[in-house]
């Protein structure tokens, strides 16, 4: 007391513990309930699991910037969950653990937004797209196809796909991955397939099960036309440039074989081979007509000239070899000079063996073939006229 008297006190049975150390969240792990726990889409649940080194008060946690449902699992273990919504942003799903306060009221240093095991969850609410789609055939002209040709539809997506399928010409196509996001669908054209532009369709699904809009058009305007019909020539005509008769040719004359394909089935000019009398003809084009030409020489046998036309269309379908004209035209190679077999002269006189002034004198003769032109002289004067009667 104040005068200085001392008395020993009694020791208290209560102990006051002073705690000024904040709790630590030493374990943080993140996952979704999707089959791939690193991915999520609308409706998937995101789960954040945390562990503290001591008892804490219920923490405030947001997932995808939205309040999460927090559950105390006991033993300083907590979990927070959130179901992803349509309006949430695509990409890595953020989370935040607010200021954590232990049971004695000590707050930690601030917001926590990362895991301790590098786990992340990516939110995908966007349909996948195909940003490259192309179609070609293995035909010599890749924009055409015939029976047995292979059609390839190559496509590339803007993200990984888990499922995809394709049809070509309304038939199931064989699908092969070329890389992580690139695929090719192939199909062999059949006789039962419909002619024209070859249709295709691609269905595909991304890693979280979102289906893209079916694709049936290319991104580069490519297309392939199926043609299973052999080309046809609807006009074939042969003639010569003989000055007397285009049905006849002699040495020095030219012979022309003119033909025209059906305009709906173009043929490849470089594929055309024309022969006349066994000789390869020179080929030229006049509008939609093709003309094969040879010059007649003495080595070509006499008689009706034979010819062939071979050709293929744009799809490489071969046409049937043409050996006849469409208008029954022909050219006869004449190698025998004309001859006069017999000659008869008479007059219009009562006695045909005599003639007086004013009488008409006739010369009648028989040739071995039809003559084109002739010069007849009677008594030193050119005949005023002549006529053709019969074949001789």
Language model: regions and residue ranges:
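Contiguous beta-strand segments of beta-sheet-rich domains
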Residues: 1-2, 10, 61, 80-103, ...
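Polar, enzyme-active/binding microenvironments
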Residues: 4, 41, 123, 142, ...
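Flexible, low-complexity linkers/stalks enriched in Thr/Pro that connect modular domains
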Residues: 8-28, 102, 113-138, 217-234, ...
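Short, solvent-exposed loop/linker segments at the N-terminal edge
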Residues: 34-44, 140-149, 244-253, 349-359
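Extracellular beta-sheet repeat scaffolds used for adhesion and glycan interaction
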Residues: 34-37, 58-88, 96, 115-116, ...
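A short beta-strand segment in extracellular, disulfide-stabilized domains
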Residues: 45-50, 150-155, 254-260, 360-364
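Extracellular/surface recognition and adhesion modules
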Residues: 52, 78-80, 100, 128, ...
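Short proline/glycine-enriched turn/loop motifs at strand-loop junctions of beta-rich domains
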Residues: 52-58, 157-163, 261-269, 367-373
């Amino acid at each position: 007391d104040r005068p200085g008297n001392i008395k020993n006190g009694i020791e208290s049975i209560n102990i006051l513990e002073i705690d000024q150390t904040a709790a630590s969240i030493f374990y943080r792990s993140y996952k979704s309930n999707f089959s791939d726990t690193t991915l999520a889409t609308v409706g998937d649940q995101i789960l954040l699991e945390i562990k503290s080194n001591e008892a804490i008060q219920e923490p405030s946690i947001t997932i995808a910037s939205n309040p999460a449902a927090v559950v105390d699992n006991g033993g300083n273990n907590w979990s927070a969950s959130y179901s992803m919504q349509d309006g949430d942003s695509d990409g890595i799903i953020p989370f935040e653990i607010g200021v954590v306060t232990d049971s004695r009221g000590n707050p930690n240093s601030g917001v926590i937004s990362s895991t301790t095991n590098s786990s992340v969850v990516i939110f995908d609410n966007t349909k996948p797209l195909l940003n490259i789609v192309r179609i070609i055939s293995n035909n010599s002209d890749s924009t055409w196809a015939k029976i047995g040709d292979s059609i390839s539809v190559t496509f590339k997506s803007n993200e990984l796909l888990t499922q995809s399928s394709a049809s070509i010409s309304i038939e199931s196509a064989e699908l092969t991955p070329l890389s992580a996001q690139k695929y090719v669908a192939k199909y062999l054209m059949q006789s039962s397939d419909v002619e024209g532009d070859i249709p295709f369709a691609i269905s595909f699904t991304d890693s979280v099960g979102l289906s893209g809009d079916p694709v049936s058009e290319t991104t580069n305007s490519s297309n392939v036309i199926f043609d299973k019909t052999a080309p046809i020539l609807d006009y074939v005509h042969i003639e010569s440039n003989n000055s007397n008769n285009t049905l006849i040719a002699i040495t020095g004359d030219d012979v022309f074989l003119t033909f025209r394909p059906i305009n709906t089935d173009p043929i490849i000019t470089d594929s055309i081979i024309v022969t006349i009398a066994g000789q390869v003809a020179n080929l030229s084009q006049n509008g939609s007509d093709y003309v094969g030409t040879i010059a007649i020489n003495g080595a070509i046998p006499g008689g009706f000239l034979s010819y062939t036309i071979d050709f293929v269309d744009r799809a490489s379908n071969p046409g049937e070899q043409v050996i006849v004209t469409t208008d029954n035209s022909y050219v006869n190679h004449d190698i025998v000079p004309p001859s006069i077999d017999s000659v008869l002269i008479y007059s219009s006189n009562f006695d045909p063996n005599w003639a007086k002034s004013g009488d008409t004198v006739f010369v009648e003769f028989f040739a071995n073939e039809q003559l084109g032109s002739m010069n007849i002289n009677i008594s030193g004067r050119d005949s005023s006229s002549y006529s053709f009667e019969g074949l001789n």
